[in-house]
C-alpha cells in the first residue's frame, strides 16, 4: 500500500531475507542494522569453490553477525539462464530457459527454501526481501522473493522490497506495475 510506514519498533522485529552474503548491504544498507534478524539463503557457489570459506570468514566478522543466520544452501548457477527478453514467472521464481541440470537445481533449491524459510516467515509480521524482478535480473533473487511472498501470503506477514531495476529486468518489473 502506498504511503504506509513501518515503525522503529516493528522494524526491530522485522526479518531481512536475502539470497547471498553482501545482498544485505547492497540492497538493504539503509535498514540492515535496524532489523531484528537477517537470513542469508545461499553460501556455496559451485562455480567458485573457494568462495564459501571466504564468505564464512566474512560472516563471522560481519558487524551484524549477532543477528545473521545463514541457511548455507548451495547456489543454483542459474544467473543468466532465464530468458530475460521474455521472462516467464514460475512457482520457483522464473522459468529457467536452460534445460537439464541448471533448471532442475533451481527447482530443487526453491523447494528447499520453502522448507527452510517457513519458520522465519511464520513468526514475522514484516519481512524485507528482494523484489519480484530480482533487482538487476538475478534468478536467485527472484526465487527468494517468490518463496518469501508465497509463504507470507498464507499468513499475515507483510513483504517489503525496493523498486530497483535495470534494463535487463525492466520487462519483468513492468508486469508488476499497477498491482
Model-based region annotation:
Residues 1-123, 153-154:
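Active-site rim/loop-helix segments in enzyme catalytic domains that contact anionic ligands
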Residues 22, 127, 140:
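Divalent metal-coordination and catalytic microenvironments
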Residues 47-48, 76-80, 135-138, 145, ...:
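Short catalytic/ligand-binding loop motif for oxyanion handling, primarily in non-cytosolic enzymes
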Residues 108, 112, 169-179:
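A conserved mid-domain beta-alpha-beta active-site/ligand-binding segment of alpha/beta enzyme cores
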Residues 158-166:
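His/Asp/Glu-enriched short active-site or ligand-binding loop at hydrolase and phosphoryl-transfer sites
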Amino acid at each position: 500500500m502506498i504511503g504506509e510506514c513501518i515503525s522503529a519498533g516493528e522494524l526491530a522485529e522485522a526479518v531481512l531475507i536475502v539470497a547471498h552474503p553482501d545482498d544485505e548491504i547492497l540492497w538493504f544498507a539503509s535498514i540492515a542494522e535496524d532489523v531484528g534478524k537477517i537470513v542469508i539463503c545461499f553460501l556455496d557457489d559451485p562455480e567458485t569453490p573457494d568462495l564459501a570459506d571466504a564468505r564464512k570468514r566474512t560472516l563471522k566478522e560481519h558487524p551484524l553477525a549477532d543477528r545473521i543466520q545463514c541457511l548455507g544452501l548451495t547456489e543454483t548457477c542459474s544467473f543468466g539462464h532465464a530468458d530475460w527478453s521474455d521472462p516467464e514467472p514460475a512457482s520457483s521464481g522464473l522459468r529457467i530457459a536452460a534445460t537439464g541440470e541448471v533448471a532442475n537445481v533451481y527447482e530443487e533449491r526453491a523447494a528447499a527454501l520453502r522448507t527452510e524459510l517457513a519458520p522465519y516467515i511464520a513468526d514475522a509480521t514484516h519481512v524485507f526481501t528482494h523484489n519480484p524482478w530480482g533487482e538487476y535480473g538475478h534468478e536467485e533473487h527472484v526465487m527468494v522473493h517468490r518463496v518469501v511472498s508465497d509463504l507470507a501470503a498464507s499468513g499475515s506477514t507483510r513483504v517489503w522490497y525496493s523498486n530497483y531495476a535495470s534494463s535487463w529486468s525492466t520487462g519483468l518489473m513492468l508486469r508488476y506495475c499497477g498491482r
